[in-house]
Curated annotation (Swiss-Prot):
The protein's name: UDP-N-acetylglucosamine--N-acetylmuramyl-(pentapeptide) pyrophosphoryl-undecaprenol N-acetylglucosamine transferase
Example of a GO biological process term: cell wall organization
UniProt keyword annotations, A-Z: Cell cycle, Cell division, Cell membrane, Cell shape, Cell wall biogenesis/degradation, Glycosyltransferase, Membrane, Peptidoglycan synthesis, Transferase
InterPro entries per record: GlcNAc_MurG, Glyco_trans_28_C, GlycoTrans_28_N
Organism: Streptococcus pneumoniae serotype 4 (strain ATCC BAA-334 / TIGR4)
Cellular compartments annotated: Cell membrane
Function: Cell wall formation. Catalyzes the transfer of a GlcNAc subunit on undecaprenyl-pyrophosphoryl-MurNAc-pentapeptide (lipid intermediate I) to form undecaprenyl-pyrophosphoryl-MurNAc-(pentapeptide)GlcNAc (lipid intermediate II).
Pfam families for this protein: Glyco_tran_28_C (PF04101), Glyco_transf_28 (PF03033)
Family that this chain belongs to: Belongs to the glycosyltransferase 28 family. MurG subfamily.
The gene coding this protein: murG
Length: 352
């Protein structure tokens, strides 16, 4: 039986594509393994998925771009992670390794290359993350969402592979209940912040609940179960699975962070959106670059977190609603998307 090893983690964005691809390989008779951190979000997501995947936990160290005494300890963690990954590779002898990035992916990528296993990696952002900059040196091939420099000879630009379904699925009963609390005459605004980026949206909704619910139906994906609430013109929930796409479709506008996975999902369904990227104090600035790219293309409006107020947000919402047809036309004309089926076929072809 053919074997494939996946790696990637630290944030949901470094796991999502793997979660989409793994069922495809399982259906085609592959034995699927995953290398990550048992305390990381990658392990949580795989457990929740229920997929028939063997998880291998390794030591991980964070890759920092700045000086920290913690770097010295993490060098040893990464080194031990490489040794652990090498033993896994030599024991499994897989046909390939697929990496979605994140600091946990560096040891498996290096170990795969050392053991002669082909390495395929994926980069979602406009600028390459530090983990993928290292991984690229060991990779057989890199797939990218955005165009990369021509000097990177091993990169193939494939566009965004989104998890948005093309099928019309039945409305969940819970969605019907939510809609009975909404005013059909008001626009619906969905706030979605990812695994760590929702706090600023949560605070905005909490501070301006009255004003917001007078003018909009508000959906707030909080990541915090203590905020769960369903009342007139307001639905706050910590986490959704089957409801995720129906809520996206229900919304007239989405207010989101600038992670590539989410904004390309919005592009795929031509959904109006305001991007509030994580700042450089909380990230390497990739979300700022992603947001600027989408604004330049005419797909979205952006708003820096430091400028986020009720008034500034409402100005952006009003502008998008007033120019809805223009934004949607540009999104629908985009050629920057790739279906999961097409990407899977491309990957299988490259593996053969």
């Amino acid at each position: 039986m053919k074997k494939i090893v996946f790696t990637g983690g630290g944030t949901v964005g470094h796991v999502t594509l793997n979660l989409l691809l793994m069922p495809k390989f399982i259906e085609d008779g592959w034995e699927v393994h995953y290398i990550g951190d048992k305390c990381g979000i990658e392990h949580q997501e795989i457990l929740k998925s229920g997929l028939d995947v063997t998880f291998h936990s390794i030591a991980t160290g964070k890759l920092r771009r700045y000086f920290s005494w913690q770097n010295m300890l993490d060098v040893f963690k990464v080194g031990w992670g490489i040794v652990q990954s090498l033993f896994i590779m030599l024991r499994l002898r897989p046909q390939t390794l697929f990496s979605k990035g994140g600091f946990v992916s560096v040891p498996p990528v290096i170990a795969a290359r050392v053991s002669g296993v082909p390495v395929f990696i994926h980069e979602s952002d406009l600028s390459m993350g530090l983990a993928n900059k290292i991984a690229y040196k060991f990779a057989t091939k890199m797939y990218s969402t955005f165009e990369q420099a021509s000097s990177l000879a091993k990169v193939e630009h494939v566009g965004a592979v989104t998890k948005v379904s093309d099928k019309n699925t039945p409305e969940p009963d819970e969605l019907v209940d939510i809609q009975t609390h909404f005013n059909p005459k008001l626009p619906t605004v969905l706030f979605v912040g990812g695994s760590a980026g929702a706090r600023v949206f949560n605070q905005l909704v909490t501070d301006h609940k009255k004003e917001l619910t007078e003018r909009y139906n508000i959906i707030n994906l909080t990541g915090d179960s203590s905020l769960n609430e369903l009342r007139q013109n307001l639905f706050r929930v910590d986490y959704v699975t089957d409801l995720y796409q129906p809520l996206m479709e229900l919304a007239d506008i989405v207010v989101t962070r600038g992670g590539a996975n989410t904004i390309f999902e919005l592009l795929a369904i031509a959904k109006l959106h305001v991007i509030v990227p994580l700042g450089r104090e909380a990230s390497r600035g990739d979300q700022i670059e992603n947001a600027a790219y989408f604004v330049k293309k005419g797909y979205a409006e952006d708003l820096q977190e430091s400028d986020l107020t009720l008034d500034s947000l409402e100005e952006k919402l009003s502008h998008l609603l007033s120019h809805k047809e223009d934004y949607q036309a540009k999104m629908k004309a985009s050629k920057e998307l790739k279906s999961l089926a097409d990407f899977y076929q491309l990957l299988k072809k490259d593996l053969s």
